[in-house]
Regions:
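Predominantly flavin-linked oxidoreductase catalytic cores and closely associated redox partners
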Residues: 113-253, 287
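Hydrophobic anchor at the start of a short beta-strand
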Residues: 12, 33-35, 156
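Beta1/beta-strand and adjacent pyrophosphate-binding region of the FAD-binding site
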Residues: 7-20
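Conserved Rossmann-like nucleotide-cofactor binding loop
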Residues: 20, 43, 163
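C-terminal helical "tail/cap" subdomain of flavin- and related membrane-associated enzymes
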Residues: 312-412
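FAD/FMN-dependent oxidoreductases across multiple families
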Residues: 127-129, 233-310, 316, 322-326
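A conserved beta-strand/loop capping segment in the N-terminal third of enzymes
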Residues: 55-109
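Glycine-rich FAD pyrophosphate-binding loop
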Residues: 26-49
Length: 412
C-alpha cells in the first residue's frame, strides 16, 4: 500500500499545470524562485476544456504572438450573431482580431516555457489538501502513484481551475455557484455552409438559456462547437442546436462529433478575496473570467504575472503574510477592475432580456448600421475600454442608449 513520503521543501508551489499555472510558474522561475507545479493529469493539455478562441492583440501584449507553427488553427475577422428568431447581426472587421489555438499544444508550449525557465513539473500528482500551521498555508499534500508527498513552500499558488477545495482550506470565499453555467464543447467534422473567417454565435433560451452557443470553423474543414446554459442538459441543447436550429443545422446537420467535453464556467466576477497567509488564487479558481463571454485565459494570464511578481517579492522580503500578499489583489483590480465592473453590468443586462427583446435589439443594431461602426475594433478582452471607444461613434452611442432603455424597462 502506498505510504506517506517525507516532506520536501520548495520556495513556491503552483497547483495546476494549465495556461495560468504554467504562466505563473514561468514568471516565478524567471524571478529566481524555485518553483514546482503539481498537475493531476498525466499529460499537460489533456483533456482540453476550452475552445481556445483568443484575442490576437492580447496574446501579442503578453508576448505570446505570433505563436509557433501548428498551434493556431484559424484566424477571424468577422462574427455573425443569430438572434432567437434567427435575425442575423454581422460584424466584419478590417483585419483579423482573434484566433483559435489547439489547446493541447498551447498548454504544452506554456509548460515548456516554464520548464525552460527552471520550473519543475510533477505530473499525475493531485494536490489533496494544504499544509496549515497557525493560520498560514505552508505547502501542500500531493497524491501520486507512489504515495502521498508533503511539500512545504513559502507561497502556494492555486491555479487549479473551477474548484473551491483549496479555497475553503485557505479561508477564502468559495466560487458563487449561482453564477455558474454548464458548458459542453465538441470537435466536429464535415461542416458545411460556414464562412471560414467568421465565428457564429447563437442566442436564445431554446438552445442556450442564460448564455450562448457557438460554431468556430477550422482551416481543415472541421469546427469547434459548443454552448453553455444556466439550466437543463447541455448535451441535449447541443443536439438541438446541431439538428434543429434553422441556421446552425445547415452548418452542422451532417457533421459528426469526434470529441466532446463538459465543464462549468463562472460568470460572477472575481471572488471577494484572492489572497491569504502564504496563499494566492489565480485564474478560474479566483473567477478571473469575463462575465460576458466566459473567457478566462487572457485575464488569467494577466493576473498570473501579478501573482508571480507578488509572491517573489514576498519571498525576498521574508513576509508572506496576507497583508503583504494583498497587493496582488490591489494590482489586479487596478489592471482589470473597470473592465470587470462593466462586464458584470453587461451580464446582468443580458440576463434581464427576453428573447423578444433580444430580437428587437438585433433589428435596431442592423437599422443603425452598428456593424459598420465597429469595423475598426481591435480590443475585445478589455470590454470597459471597448465601451469607451464605442461611445465616440454616433451609431454605437445610439445603440447603447437603446440598450440602456431596454435594461431599465426590464429592471423596474
Amino acid at each position: 500500500m502506498p505510504g506517506c513520503m517525507m516532506k520536501t521543501i520548495k520556495e513556491a508551489v503552483v497547483v495546476g499545470g494549465g495556461p495560468v499555472g504554467s504562466t505563473t510558474a514561468f514568471h516565478l522561475s524567471q524571478l529566481g524562485v524555485a518553483t514546482t507545479v503539481f498537475e493531476e493529469h498525466d499529460e499537460i493539455g489533456v483533456p482540453s476544456h476550452c475552445a481556445g478562441h483568443l484575442s490576437i492583440r492580447s496574446l501579442r501584449s503578453l508576448g505570446l504572438y505570433p505563436l509557433p507553427n501548428g498551434i493556431v488553427e484559424n484566424v477571424f475577422s468577422a462574427a455573425n450573431f443569430h438572434s432567437p428568431a434567427s435575425t442575423t447581426f454581422s460584424i466584419r472587421l478590417k483585419r483579423p482580431v482573434t484566433c483559435t489555438v489547439n489547446r493541447e499544444l498551447f498548454d504544452k508550449l506554456l509548460a515548456e516555457r516554464a520548464r525552460a525557465a527552471g520550473a519543475e513539473y510533477r505530473l499525475g500528482s493531485r494536490v489533496s489538501s494544504l499544509l496549515m500551521d497557525n493560520g498560514f498555508v505552508k505547502g501542500v499534500n500531493a497524491e501520486h502513484d507512489s504515495g502521498v508527498e508533503s511539500v512545504a513552500s513559502r507561497v502556494t499558488v492555486d491555479a487549479e481551475g473551477i474548484s473551491s477545495r483549496l479555497l475553503r482550506e485557505a479561508g477564502l470565499p468559495r466560487l458563487n455557484g449561482a453564477r455558474l453555467v454548464h458548458a459542453v464543447e465538441a470537435e466536429v467534422e464535415n461542416v458545411a455552409n460556414v464562412q471560414m473567417d467568421a465565428v457564429e454565435v447563437f442566442i436564445g433560451k431554446d438552445y442556450a438559456p442564460g448564455f450562448y452557443a457557438w460554431v468556430i470553423p477550422r482551416r481543415d474543414g472541421s469546427a469547434k462547437v459548443g454552448l453553455a446554459a444556466k439550466s437543463g442538459n447541455p448535451k441535449e441543447f447541443l443536439q438541438r442546436l446541431m439538428f434543429k436550429h434553422p441556421v446552425a443545422s445547415r452548418m452542422l446537420g451532417n457533421s459528426r462529433i469526434v470529441k466532446i467535453a463538459f465543464h462549468s464556467v463562472t460568470l460572477g466576477g472575481p471572488i471577494p478575496r484572492t489572497y491569504a497567509n502564504g496563499f494566492l488564487a489565480v485564474g478560474d479558481v479566483a473567477s478571473q473570467v469575463k462575465p460576458t463571454t466566459g473567457g478566462g485565459i487572457i485575464f488569467g494570464l494577466t493576473c498570473a504575472r501579478v501573482a508571480a511578481e507578488t509572491a517573489a517579492a514576498a519571498i525576498r522580503a521574508g513576509d508572506v503574510s496576507a497583508f503583504f500578499l494583498g497587493q496582488y489583489q490591489r494590482r489586479c483590480r487596478e489592471a482589470l477592475g473597470f473592465d470587470f465592473s462593466v462586464m458584470l453590468r453587461a451580464r446582468r443586462f443580458l440576463d434581464s432580456l427576453s428573447d423578444e427583446k433580444i430580437d428587437k435589439a438585433f433589428r435596431i443594431c442592423n437599422r443603425l448600421g452598428l456593424g459598420k461602426a465597429l469595423e475598426d475594433v481591435e480590443e475585445i478582452d478589455f470590454q470597459g475600454r471597448l465601451l469607451l471607444q464605442m461611445l465616440t461613434k454616433p451609431a454605437s452611442a445610439t445603440a447603447l442608449a437603446y440598450f440602456l432603455l431596454l435594461y431599465l424597462s426590464a429592471n423596474p
